[in-house]
Amino acid sequence: MIVRKNMGRAKSLLMLLMVLGFFFATYNLVSMIMDHRAGNWVADGLESFDRKMLGSASTNAKYHVALTATDAAYSQWQCRIMYYWYKKVKDMPGSNMGKFTRILHSGRTDQLMDEIPTFVVDPLPEGLDRGYIVLNRPWAFVQWLEKADIEEEYILMAEPDHIFVNPLPNLASRTQPAGYPFFYIKPAENEKIIRKFYPKDKGPVTDVDPIGNSPVIIQKSLIEEIAPTWVNVSLRMKDDPETDKAFGWVLEMYAYAVASALHGVKHILRKDFMLQPPWDRHVGKTFIIHYTYGCDYNLKGELTYGKIGEWRFDKRSYLMGPPPKNLSLPPPGVPESVVRLVKMVNEATANIPEWDSLNRS
């Protein structure tokens, strides 16, 4: 499925964001945005948060699963596995999943349009991401939220390298979205930098949660307000050399955390939201496997992280095309989480049509 409309509106909105982002470069841009009430898409901190979060929604409300992606083979094969497991767990007891959308920010259709529900949006103007493609994520969400018809009251912001390992309920409450605490997102330890974007008059630096935008379950009305601020903060962070150097590949995650704080939003921190092999060894009642790290082991089942193992599974080994079917299982002694990951990848690749031939870069 493809939905694409009113791109002119989206481009106009981007121009507005860029003007705000660069015209006020010598001032605190975010403060200016928060005071700019004429634009309905950015609200006024805690007042907006209270207004939106005191609605009638209950925590068993359905949420829409949304992930951003490109048309590169590396992104495509991960999306196919993710969508396979979404369909497997969607209607299981305990799940509050609604519909699914792959937000494709390549600006054009690809060969998965008929397989995965997809909404095509524009990428940032050429060169604006400075090679950091993840900057397209907040802008993709802004466009999708503005133009798509979304039935659910809540949204799960997910990523292609997520696998649903257990049915996922709506973890958000009536007053707070739910997020996952990342050990490497440390606002307090980076207070000097955070204060460039979250000044002292806004509150303590502990207002900034140790999260990224994914996984997060959040009310649609709330992310509609946060997303444009997220775009602005991301661009400002990337434009600041000190911030860019300090935050590196997690810059966009910090930007979401700061944008949320600017809107007075605190997240429920759920460690059981997600596990990340090989560091998290057991699946238990966790809901999502995030296979962002390489898993390298010797044949004794000992982790050799940082050194290519005699047995390995690393998504980056498959940049140009999908992994083969029936990957070898890890040797004895490897943690359950890694074994479960490989088995789930194998099940998906065995059942997805045209796995070996569809998406090659």
From Swiss-Prot:
Question: Which lineage?
Answer: Eukaryota, Viridiplantae, Streptophyta, Embryophyta, Tracheophyta
Native species: Lotus japonicus
Q: What GO cellular component entries does it have?
A: Golgi membrane
What gene, per UniProt, encodes this protein?
A: PLENTY
Keyword hit for Cell membrane: no
Function in brief:
Glycosyltransferase involved in the O-arabinosylation of several proteins including extensins and small signaling peptides. Catalyzes the transfer of the initial L-arabinose to the hydroxyl group of Hyp residues. Probably involved in the arabinosylation of CLAVATA3/ESR-related (CLE) signaling peptides that move from root to shoot, to interact with receptor kinase signaling that regulates nodulation. Involved in long distance nodulation signaling events.
Q: Pfam families annotated for this entry?
A: HPAT
Q: Which reaction does it catalyse?
A: trans-4-hydroxy-L-prolyl-[protein] + UDP-beta-L-arabinofuranose = O-(beta-L-arabinofuranosyl)-trans-4-hydroxy-L-prolyl-[protein] + UDP + H(+)
Show the coiled coil region(s). Answer: none
Q: For this UniProt entry, which segments traverse the membrane?
A: 13-33
Its record classes its membrane topology as:
Single-pass type II membrane protein
Top-rank taxon? Eukaryota
Keyword check for Glycosyltransferase: yes
Q: Name one GO molecular function term.
A: hydroxyproline O-arabinosyltransferase activity
Q: What happens when the gene is disrupted?
A: Dramatic increase in root nodule number when inoculated with Mesorhizobium loti. Inhibition of root and shoot growth.
Provide the disulphide bond pattern: none
Mostly located where? Answer: Golgi
Protein location? Golgi apparatus membrane
| Name of this protein | Hydroxyproline O-arabinosyltransferase PLENTY
Q: Which InterPro entries match?
A: HPAT-like (IPR056508), HPAT/SRGT1-like (IPR044845)
